């Protein structure tokens, strides 16, 4: 599962 989202000007990517 891949997820990416934008939070407080920072991009988080969870694999």
UniProtKB/Swiss-Prot annotation:
Its EC number is 3.2.1.20. Keywords: Glycosidase, Hydrolase. It is an enzyme of class 3 (hydrolase). It comes from the Bacteria. It catalyses: Hydrolysis of terminal, non-reducing (1->4)-linked alpha-D-glucose residues with release of alpha-D-glucose. GO terms for molecular function: alpha-1,4-glucosidase activity. Belongs to the glycosyl hydrolase 13 family. This is Maltase.
